[in-house]
UniProtKB/Swiss-Prot annotation:
Pfam families assigned: GP41, HERV-K_env_2, HERV-K_REC
Taxonomic lineage of the native organism: Eukaryota, Metazoa, Chordata, Craniata, Vertebrata
PANTHER family: ENDOGENOUS RETROVIRUS GROUP K MEMBER 113 ENV POLYPROTEIN-RELATED
Membrane spanning stretches: 633-653
Entry keyword Transmembrane helix: yes
Subunit relationships: The surface (SU) and transmembrane (TM) proteins form a heterodimer. SU and TM are attached by noncovalent interactions or by a labile interchain disulfide bond.
Protein name: Endogenous retrovirus group K member 113 Env polyprotein
Organism per entry: Homo sapiens (Human)
Protein family: Belongs to the beta type-B retroviral envelope protein family. HERV class-II K(HML-2) env subfamily.
UniProt keyword Acyltransferase, yes or no: no
Length: 699
């Protein structure tokens, strides 16, 4: 094949470009998602610059390095898409969209948590065994086992010291505590028979017998029944431990550092030497299993305890009462007995039985306390929403008032498998937050105002159709009112089912009256009801806020208030601290902001929604009344009389002019008729005399 033939068979380049152009054009128009509706507020996006793409690549690379994910093209693309979606979902800073309207909004129950502090009220903690541990019981926890142990990273702030349990600064340390009941015996060699319970509790930092200002001070002593001076006797049922709250003679200190001072007035029973009546030196040192370094070992391996001395053994700090810690510095808060129910469930409790015997050695009385254990009871403690437990390496920073925890777990229950190498932080859902939100229209209280405003924008420019359009608007408002009335009827129909509720309540009343004891299933339902009441209390507080606020009509999940967001007064860093839960001098002043918002809402509540717009329409209609024009000139009798005379004169003048015009019109009509008659007779007057023609014209 010669070169000329090859050149003739080769396709021309220009034709190839022509075939490729339609394909490129179609590729430019191809989309991978549904076509989105273009709104009036939609703006054309600028193409990304090289600097933006470079920055996005750097952020994606940094994210993959932090998460230890291999950098592949697929992972880089996913990381970039995640960063873009996160940036798009972030709140728009003030000034980014000058055409938008920014107002303060109250968001109830956002997906945020805060730490439970020592100033909060005690929470409900449920145990699965009411025989050995007092308090509400529930053996059907957790409610959602598949969600237990979900991983979470937290970084939240606090105002008052948070409640934390574990071996870490700012947390209450665990320890083993004993509770003992006594049974007197008549045996000559046995003085007493003991039944003792050992379990996990809260460790005191200072020995309660040492002289300490907080211990001997009655300033923080709670009101309650004093602990008995005698050891509680055994109850009728030997398998039940009877708990009775009491106040000891002195307090123990659980924590005293930069995080605050926490004390407990519950009794801390342990054996000590009774040196009363002894002539020789008698050591009054205490002997307590709580000094063991390994907590689990003290409860698992030590199944036999023996105490021997030449001096009689006595049990100090009588009383079967649970710890009730409270904070007294830097602030004074309520007692929190629920913390012990969480701690005691972290390991099984051990049941002891034994006695104290008396024998003679070297011609001296010799006392021996012998305790043996062969029974352990596993426990489980749970909390319910809106409360949760964050378990992990919790770090509390008092300088910045922040709490951080990486790779922590969210739990609602604690059992004997818990490892005290971790810490427990009590958290709860946030009741509500204040954030600025942007809108593409001004704030409006009701849809009627919105409808009326949109219609009046066109009405004011077309005054000829004003009355008809106003009637249409009023008919639209009536339709809205009718819809609300129909909804009220439907609600009334639902309320009529209260008869069924009454019948059900009567049946349940008979059930409660006829039932002698409550089984565990009903007890669980009661606990759920109690927790629901607590949750509903938070909901009612949120509803109270929303009732006090005048909100925009087009939002239902949260409330957009009429208070305009001022960036110079509340910059975004203050809002960010508020979202984190930090409350310091730089944080958003919520109380002051609430006062401003409530004042703005009160100003809008002075008028019924739509009254201002309807009043403007009424004023416009009133201006069309000519009577108002007369009233504006004057209201005296003389002026009114002059005006009446002027009106009569004008009326008379109009009548005279009308009569004159009518006469002129008659003359014109007669002349026209005469001219018409003459034109018809123009050819028929030739044979007549001149006299007859004159007569005809005169006629």
């Amino acid at each position: 094949m010669n070169p000329s033939e090859m050149q003739r068979k080769a396709p021309p380049r220009r034709r190839r470009h022509r075939n490729r152009a339609p394909l490129t054009h179609k590729m430019n128009k191809m989309v991978t998602s549904e076509e989105q509706m273009k709104l009036p507020s939609t703006k054309k996006a600028e193409p990304p610059t090289w600097a933006q793409l470079k920055k996005l690549t750097q952020l994606a690379t940094k994210y993959l390095e932090n998460t230890k994910v291999t950098q592949t093209p697929e992972s880089m693309l996913l990381a970039a898409l995640m960063i873009v979606s996160m940036v798009v979902s972030l709140p728009m800073p003030a000034g980014a969209a000058a055409a938008n309207y920014t107002y303060w909004a109250y968001v109830p129950f956002p997906p945020l948590i805060r730490a439970v502090t020592w100033m909060d009220n005690p929470i409900e903690v449920y145990v699965n065994d009411s025989v050995w541990v007092p308090g509400p019981t529930d053996d059907h926890c957790p409610a959602k086992p598949e969600e237990e142990g979900m991983m979470i990273n937290i970084s939240i702030g606090y105002r008052y010291p948070p409640i934390c349990l574990g071996r870490a600064p700012g947390c209450l340390m665990p320890a083993v505590q004993n509770w003992l009941v006594e049974v007197p015996t008549v045996s000559p060699i046995s003085r007493f028979t003991y039944h003792m319970v050992s379990g996990m509790s809260l460790r005191p930092r200072v020995n309660y017998l040492q002289d300490f200002s907080y211990q001997r001070s009655f300033k923080f002593r709670p009101k309650g029944k004093p602990c008995p001076k005698e050891i509680p006797k055994e109850s009728k049922n030997t398998e039940v431990l009877v708990w009775e709250e009491c106040v000891a003679n002195s307090a123990v200190i659980l924590q005293n550092n930069e995080f605050g001072t926490i004390i407990d007035w519950a009794p801390r029973g342990q054996f000590y030497h009774n040196c009363s009546g002894q002539t020789q030196s008698c050591p009054s040192a205490q002997v307590s299993p709580a000094v063991d370094s390994d907590l689990t070992e003290s409860l698992d391996k030590h199944k036999h305890k023996k105490l021997q001395s030449f001096y009689p053994w006595e049990w100090g700090e009588k009383g079967i009462s649970t710890p009730r810690p409270k904070i007294i510095s830097p602030v004074s808060g309520p007692e929190h007995p629920e913390l012990w129910r969480l701690t005691v469930a972290s390991h099984h409790i051990r049941i002891w039985s034994g006695n104290q015997t008396l024998e003679t050695r070297d011609r001296k009385p010799f006392y021996t306390v012998d305790l043996n254990s062969s029974l352990t009871v596993p426990l489980q403690s749970c909390i319910k929403p809106p409360y949760m437990l964050v378990v992990g390496n919790i770090v509390i920073k008092p300088d910045s008032q922040t709490i951080t925890c990486e790779n922590c777990r969210l739990l609602t229950c604690i059992d004997s498998t818990f490892n005290w190498q971790h810490r427990i932080l009590l958290v709860r859902a946030r009741e509500g937050v204040w954030i600025p939100v942007s809108m593409d229209r001004p704030w409006e209280a009701s849809p009627s105002i919105h409808t009326l405003t949109e219609v009046l924008k066109g009405v004011l420019n077309r005054s000829k159709r004003f009355i008809f359009t106003l009637i249409a608007v009023i008919m639209g408002l009536i339709a809205v009112t009718a819809t609300a009335a129909v909804a009220g009827v439907a609600l009334h129909s639902s309320v009529q089912s209260v008869n069924f509720v009454n019948d059900w309540q009567k049946n349940s009343t008979r059930l409660w009256n006829s039932q002698s004891s409550i089984d565990q299933k009903l007890a669980n339902q009661i606990n759920d009801l109690r927790q629901t009441v607590i949750w509903m209390g938070d909901r009612l507080m949120s509803l109270e806020h929303r009732f006090q606020l005048q909100c925009d009509w087009n939002t239902s999940d949260f409330s957009i208030t009429p208070q305009i967001y001022n960036e110079s007064e509340h910059h975004w860093d203050m809002v960010r601290r508020h979202l984190q839960g930090r409350e310091d001098n730089l944080t958003l002043d919520i109380s002051k902001l609430k006062e401003q918002i409530f004042e703005a809402s009160k100003a809008h509540l002075n008028l019924v929604p739509g009254t201002e717009a309807i009043a403007g329409v009424a004023d416009g209609l009133a201006n069309l009344n000519p009577v108002t024009w007369v009233k504006t000139i004057g209201s005296t009798t003389i002026i009114n009389l002059i005006l009446i005379l002027v009106c009569l004169f004008c009326l008379l003048l109009v009548c005279r002019c009308t009569q004159q015009l009518r006469r002129d019109s008659d003359h014109r009509e007669r002349a026209m008729m005469t001219m018409a008659v003459l034109s018809k007779r123009k050819g028929g007057n030739v044979g007549k005399s001149k006299r007859d023609q004159i007569v005809t014209v005169s006629v």
